[in-house]
From Swiss-Prot:
It is a multi-pass membrane protein. It catalyses: di-trans,octa-cis-undecaprenyl diphosphate + H2O = di-trans,octa-cis-undecaprenyl phosphate + phosphate + H(+). The keyword Heme does not apply. This is Undecaprenyl-diphosphatase. It comes from the Bacteria. The chain crosses the membrane at residues 88-108, 117-137, 157-179, 191-211, 227-247, 255-275. Its main location: membrane. Keywords: Antibiotic resistance, Cell membrane, Cell shape, Cell wall biogenesis/degradation, Hydrolase, Membrane, Peptidoglycan synthesis, Transmembrane, Transmembrane helix. One of its GO terms (cellular component) is plasma membrane. Belongs to the UppP family. It is an enzyme of class 3 (hydrolase). It is found in: Cell membrane. One of its GO terms (molecular function) is undecaprenyl-diphosphatase activity.
Length: 277
């Protein structure tokens, strides 16, 4: 049964990681309804995210290679620092700093109290409303060539908010991008690139802890988690292409209503003790 549950959670991770609806919240919610009725845990979540971030690397492979080459070239002087690809490399590094620092400072809280379903429900609703405002009032004039270092660090703090399940990594960064005047597609694209260092760092750290301790602190072992990670990669790759096409022509209204309704449903389920916090 654990294999089936892990496969289902891998599917959920792949479907939700790149949408502004919080994959960690969905893993937490779906896990409560499975036979184990348990939180998959922060380690399981972080490791399966390695699958979806690998999908980002494969999907944006040419862009990433170009950015990395230009960034290294800027270090040796072969490429000017203001080269767009070199700048993007620096912007990704800069934007990754907040989540790394805050993730280390609040690691214990992230793995325990912040995974409360009450917090998940609240964050789904609150940040759904903020996304609605950003989508409505954002000028949506800027593209990524206009991304400044100041905006890069603001993106980074928005990403760090996703350490709280229910906020959504992509939701937080996309919301910040819209509020700063970037187009929906530009905000989503930078969100995907920005997540790579943070997610790989967190996932590899949790994988190291898991291997060192010979097991996961949760209902699923390493083999089941590996299966979930592979499924998350395959499904996530498909979702990236679909999502970028979707946001190029449509608003985020669908995701806003989904977040709010899901959060309200969680309040009801928690209030009637159908699921535990």
């Amino acid at each position: 049964m654990n294999w089936i549950e892990a496969a289902l959670l891998g599917l959920v991770q792949g479907l939700t990681e790149f949408l502004p609806i919080s994959s960690s919240a969905h893993l937490r919610i779906v896990g409560s309804f499975l036979p184990n009725a348990a939180d998959p845990g922060a380690a399981f979540t972080a490791i399966t995210q390695l699958g979806t971030e690998t999908a980002v690397i494969v999907y944006f492979w040419r862009d990433i290679v170009r950015i990395v080459q230009a960034w290294f070239g800027s270090l040796t002087g072969k490429v000017e620092r203001n080269n767009p690809d070199a700048r993007m490399g620096w912007l990704v590094i800069l934007g990754s700093l907040p989540i790394i620092v805050l993730g280390l400072l609040f690691q214990d809280q992230i793995e325990s109290v912040l995974r409360s379903m009450w917090i998940v429900a609240t964050m789904l609703i609150v940040f759904g409303m903020i996304l609605a405002v950003a989508d409505a009032v954002g000028r949506q004039e800027r593209d990524l060539t206009q991304l400044s270092y100041k905006h890069g660090i603001l993106y980074g703090f928005a990403q760090a908010m996703a350490l709280i399940p229910g906020v959504s990594r992509s939701g937080g960064t996309i919301t910040a991008g819209l509020l700063m005047g970037y187009t929906r597609e530009a905000a989503a694209r930078y969100s995907f690139l920005l997540a790579i260092p943070a997610v790989f760092g967190s996932g590899l750290y949790q994988l190291y802890k898991t291997v060192s301790n010979e097991g996961l602190a949760g209902p699923y072992g390493l083999p089941e988690t590996a299966l979930a990670t592979v499924i998350a990669f395959v499904v996530g790759y498909v979702i990236i292409g679909w999502f970028l096409k979707f946001v190029s022509t449509r608003s985020y209204r669908l995701f806003v209503w989904y977040r709010i309704l899901l959060g309200l449903a969680l309040y009801v389920l928690l209030g009637f003790n159908v699921i535990s916090a």
